[in-house]
Amino acid sequence: MDPAVTVIIPTYNWSSVLPYSIGSVLRQTFTELEVLVVGDGCTDDSEAVVGRIGDPRVKWINLPTNTGHQSEPNNEGLRQARGQFIAYLGHDDLWLPHHLSCLISALKQGADLAYGMTLYVTGGSDRYDRCLWPPCDYGPDFRIIPPTCVVHRRSVTDHIGGWRHYRELDWYPDLELWLRAYTANYRFACVPRLTAIKFPAVARRDVYKMRPSHEQAAWSQRIQNEDNFEIAELIRTIRAMAVQGRPQPIEFTKIASMAPYRVLLHDFLQETRKRLMRRGRRLISRPARSKGDATDAAPEPKGNVIDVAREFKGLPRMP
């Protein structure tokens, strides 16, 4: 019998984080799944690490060459997927145990693509050590939804195609994929639950040179051992965002008085979405410069946004 969900974990030469990301999948309350860990031409011990997990639902796949981005590993996962639903998980990210059950419930109610809230842990690389990221709809031309928090029907990518190579694009491949799904009139659903923890490599200079896993280990233990982790972490993070100087998303008195979870989350989503919508409109409606403007710069080559990110993370530019 085929699994209901195929979880695709793209990875490249960072084996120490894999037990934590894969472990967060195997602890899901929804268990009808397979896990495809797809190496982007890995040359380290990732295959051995995956093999030691010892769960028949977990399969290792390795591309013959390194392609430089998660797009091609994700496409290979799509080709080999047996599930009717597709989920993505960054190799250094974690899911809360209810992630799949919440998002699949939204799909069974009629959505084609569902996504939850993500906690971004920046590792103290700037003055904000963490922030909540409700996936944002800036309008039909700008949809920011981290792949780690997404589950979609397999039929979506069967119809519109998979991930495009980053060298074909001016922007991020995930944004382009969501835009294609949106313009093809697929139905998106935001589930108002914290379901994923993201450790963005673009917030950690040279992280691929060090390849640490201590953050994933610590957060994994907290998710497993803390009572009411989701609600407690929402409150802690909103407090931290207020103290650290981020725009206060809701009245602080509601946090201090431990308002009901649904009210707290609803207000946070509503207020944060308003701010991000305003920001998004500014991003997509900047006036075009007139020809000959002295501030004009040569257009960036396609894929440059990914090449710059690779260098920051400690990876070389692809040839």
Regions inferred by a protein language model and the residue ranges of each:
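Conserved short acidic donor-positioning loop in nucleotide-sugar-dependent glycosyltransferases
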Residues: 13, 25, 40-44, 53, ...
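Conserved nucleotide-sugar donor-binding catalytic segment
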Residues: 135-222
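Short alpha-helix within the catalytic core of nucleotide-sugar-dependent glycosyltransferases
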Residues: 19-23, 47, 83, 96-108, ...
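Glycine-rich, basic loop-to-helix element that forms the pyrophosphate-binding segment
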Residues: 64-81
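Short, acidic, metal-binding catalytic loop of nucleotide-sugar glycosyltransferases
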Residues: 23-32
